[in-house]
Amino acid sequence: MPVARAIGLLLIGVMAGLGLDLCAKAILETYPLEQFVFLRSLIGLSIFLSLARQFGGLAALATRKWGWHLLRTLLAAGAMFGFFYGMARMPLIDALTLGFTAPLMMTALSVPMLGEHVGWRRWLAVVAGFGGVLMILRPGSGAITFAAVAVLFAAFCYACLAITARRLAPTESTYCLSIYVIAGPMAVSGVLSAGATWQVPDTAGWILFMLAGICSVVAWIGLVGAYRQASPSILAPFEYTALIGGAIAGYLIWDEVPDRWVVAGALVIIGSGLFVVYREVGGASSIRYLRTITASGSASLARRFGKTRSELDG
């Protein structure tokens, strides 16, 4: 039953991540982006810090790699601002689908940034995946908007976060990497909103802000638990249930209906992403895979697998 339990935890994590996106889209209809990023990050960070004892206390945040963490905080801010800016201005399913190009970008970036070898099959999958992006954006159709570019920029930032996590994984704990990429967007949004007049949330607004912060933590915990109990090659396909949930929610809440090009492009991106996962991690260590992806800054990508915390964070 461990696999069934892992799939259940994964689905909880995925749905919580989708809940975060739904809260964000609703919040951004009324409140400024920088206010949302700040309060969402503040609430999420407060919850994470309350769990510090489970990860070795605040001593787990000690680091000598401040330059790397500064870079990662900027990348995390770019990822969060880019994704939520775009999602607020385009159909939910379109934004989620474009966001799933991050694993393809990570594969491509691993060659120049890490010197890794990527075989022709994975390169073909990457090219096919970006062909799916072109199907969604349809150059010349007017679908290439600044919002779409912002989401792709966010996916690029997520990919860079994953690459830098690979560089830092031998010396930095997963908890440390996660905390700093939550604190980064909060700091950047605080600077950007300095002197601005924030809208005081009403009761419904505070509920949405709290739900957004809680959903981000539940997503992280659910995915962490899932990848402790089953391999990425088994669980990865279930992450794409976010697209099904996003399509249903977009239709029911905002009357958004994806056209045939978005559906076709999504299928190509999903197929390419799954192929890359199976080729890259099918026979690799789940610990290595998890330590790489966890610190990408996206709760929906947070993964860890191992027998003991010391094995993971040592």
Segments from the language model and where they lie:
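Transmembrane alpha-helical segments that form core, pore/gating elements
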Residues: L22-K25, L33, F48, G140-P201, ...
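Helix-helix packing/entry segments at the starts of transmembrane helices
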Residues: L96-T101, L168-A183, W220-Y251
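Hydrophobic transmembrane alpha-helices of multi-pass small-molecule transport proteins
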Residues: R121-L137, A154, W261-E280
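Loop-to-transmembrane-helix transition segments
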Residues: R5-I12, A52-R53, L58-G82, F146-A154, ...
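C-terminal transmembrane-helix exit sites in multi-pass transporters
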Residues: Y85, A102-L124, I244-V263
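Transmembrane alpha-helices of multi-pass small-molecule transport proteins
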Residues: T30-G78, C157-C160, Y180-A196
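Hydrophobic/small/kink-forming positions within alpha-helical transmembrane segments
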Residues: V14-G19, L49, T73-F81, P103-A108, ...
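C-terminal-most transmembrane helix of multi-pass membrane proteins
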Residues: I244-G314
